[in-house]
């Protein structure tokens, strides 16, 4: 597992232009929205919520949508024949992404402060929220990956779904302003709880923490069950590659 983490770091730092793109791209993507929100005294809130959302996006690309890349590259079959379970492989990649995203987030916050004069409130608590919420986001992406394994057409709507998840989680508009039906859907996404915690300055009640833990656990259980089921079906069909 630790070899997999080391491999990802070595791969990224071997290709320096790719590394620079990964490190600095989030700032240029987030900056226009932060500048616009700053006109309404909401720059700090939008900055924090979009960084939280970017963590979900990276986890989806690395853990869920990344399955498509593994199939195209012919690597998925090798992973399934290795001693490590596929969920273990996903967990190893999740650990790598935590360190990667912490570094990217730090660079993004420094750049937004230098060039935009905007930063998040209570930086220490914000980083703590990022790390804790990433556990729920990992559970969510494991569940999401079961759909990627089952339905090939997920590849075509992946980017759209990422934006839907971000919107429902309240990365632009607080969830409490949504209609009841949308609010119900929002609370099925672990990211919602992280953004809400930031909105209320991290004064989260135990009930809210329990809801976050329960939703995350449900996604993990559903993901593990259906990932194993779909992988067994792929093994029977020999469908490990995609051309």
What spans do the regions from the language model cover?
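Hydrophobic transmembrane alpha-helices and immediately adjacent juxtamembrane helices
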Residues: 1-131, 135-243
